[in-house]
């Protein structure tokens, strides 16, 4: 991919969004993700990376190479939260619309206990969650603005089915706030939720509790207590954020989706508000196992608009049908905004069918010779031009393991050798070259952080904290 987003020749002007499709073992990590990560030494076009890292191997193998080129490394680990930096989704709320975006991302990728798919329950849950999170953001101390406090509020919201005048502690909080700030966004949303009768309100609370159940695990509470990822600074300085997730258990993958949702929105807003529409450092998202992280809300709109802000998304899938399963009718819109598409090999029928059609046909010359023998022998030659698939589905299914097919917008598809990672100048810094280069993530996280002049800190009075 070219580094510049605005080449002088318009025919070369393409976005950096990439769709990579390859079956298991086709080399998606070795032949695409690692070579792109090692392109970290450009001085004229600095790049930050956000990498979905199944099993946590990519950060271990390439971390030292990034450190040598001045990168700040961040790790969020949903396999082992004790070996992770902290991520607090509420730390990135700056306005009422941010509250709505956070709740949308949460509800899109988690399940409540609503009844029969009735949209009423989702809407009611949304009202309650928006009101509680808005209350925490605008009224609670910074150290209490997290999901642990949100769960504590839910746990105190007892409902009486018989006594409509009964008030739980949270009702009293909002009643008091309503007297002080009657036009508060949190109060207005909570009043709408309180229109529900006692039995209905109890069902809403049960559904919210089920949706937030993962945050009740102590490890998750600790991991989301405060924030260290600094998602809003990815476009300010060279940073590599590794999102480590399990490729066999999707329980906590919704956190990864929430990170991507907030990341795209934060960076787009920052580019528009502070940098005149263009981030100083390009942010490239290498989303491996894209189908397993859940749905990123409005992705079809984001991939169409992030290019101008110096952001790009590289979606890595095993099959195209995975994208359709998650994004339904919007999958075609997403693919349409990927100016580069790479096929590394595979045998899934839908993928092969779509690719064979995209490759088109070639013209072949057909010669038919006839030779009739007998009393009146005759000879004839018939010539015609025919259309033939450039590569049929069965040919694509047995594609050489060392080859790939690349489609660039404005250029005919072509077959190429997969990139030899060992030829990259920065390969010598990886643990693939020398096991001594392996990054010990746990040791890295426990090191003493150096303080930089532009770092900001939040001062908290220890005496004001609630008892553990």
Question: Can you annotate each of these PLM segments?
Answer:
Residues 303-405:
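Conserved ATP-driven motor cores of ASCE-family P-loop NTPases powering translocation/secretion/packaging/pilus
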Residues 2-311, 326, 394-418, 422-468:
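P-loop NTPase motor domains
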